[in-house]
């Protein structure tokens, strides 16, 4: 009675345990760090003289390429995070259902007249499976919370910083004067700082 549900709890708990969220986040952080370093390495002059205009435009173009690679990377990582979050959500739902059914079976057995050692042991096993289910539900929730933090940080960069950066990039490409170059440099720093903030929080 309830053996198939208990087995499902064991199987799903094992799947959750083996889902390597750490490896996923380590890969994401490694790629973001590399992208941030490349963007940071771009040297944007404040106001290039006419003789340096072509070189400045080359640097602006390079900054644009590095940023687009970073944006593509951020978007790609979001997709991977959403997949992991959906998997945890699905597994958590199954565990929650199993927990309710096992609790119901345990209560049924406990209210019966049969108080033999076999029945009592069975009740104990059912309750243990409920405990295991709740433990892994908590684990799944914790990992989902961490993934949501990454999503929030990445979305903030994509939604708040990237549009400003692209606008500044166009302005600087059309007119690499002091004001436009200064704004571009400020936004480049804001972009790399935002990504490094994500990395810093992710490492805690």
Residue ranges and their predicted role:
Residues 1-92, 99:
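Leu/Val/Ala/Ile-rich N-terminal alpha-helices, chiefly Sec-type signal peptides and the beginnings
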Residues 103-204:
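Long amphipathic all-alpha helical oligomerization modules
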């Amino acid at each position: 009675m309830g053996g198939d549900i208990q087995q499902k709890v064991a199987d799903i708990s094992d799947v959750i345990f083996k889902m390597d969220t750490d490896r996923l986040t380590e890969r994401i952080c490694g790629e973001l760090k590399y992208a941030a370093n490349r963007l940071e390495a771009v040297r944007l002059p404040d106001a290039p003289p006419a003789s340096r205009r072509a070189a400045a435009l080359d640097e602006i173009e390079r900054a644009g390429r590095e940023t687009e690679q970073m944006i593509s990377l951020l978007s790609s990582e979001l997709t991977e995070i959403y997949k992991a979050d959906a998997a945890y959500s699905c597994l958590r739902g199954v565990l929650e259902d199993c927990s309710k059914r096992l609790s119901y079976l345990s209560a049924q057995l406990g209210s019966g007249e049969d108080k033999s050692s076999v029945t009592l042991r069975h009740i104990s096993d059912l309750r243990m499976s409920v405990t295991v289910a709740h433990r892994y539900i908590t684990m799944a929730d914790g990992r989902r919370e961490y993934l949501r933090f990454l999503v929030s940080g990445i979305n903030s960069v994509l939604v708040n910083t990237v549009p400003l950066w692209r606008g500044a990039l166009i302005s600087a490409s059309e007119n690499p004067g002091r004001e436009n170059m200064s704004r571009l440099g400020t936004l480049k720093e804001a972009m790399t700082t935002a990504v490094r903030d994500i990395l810093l929080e992710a490492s805690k």
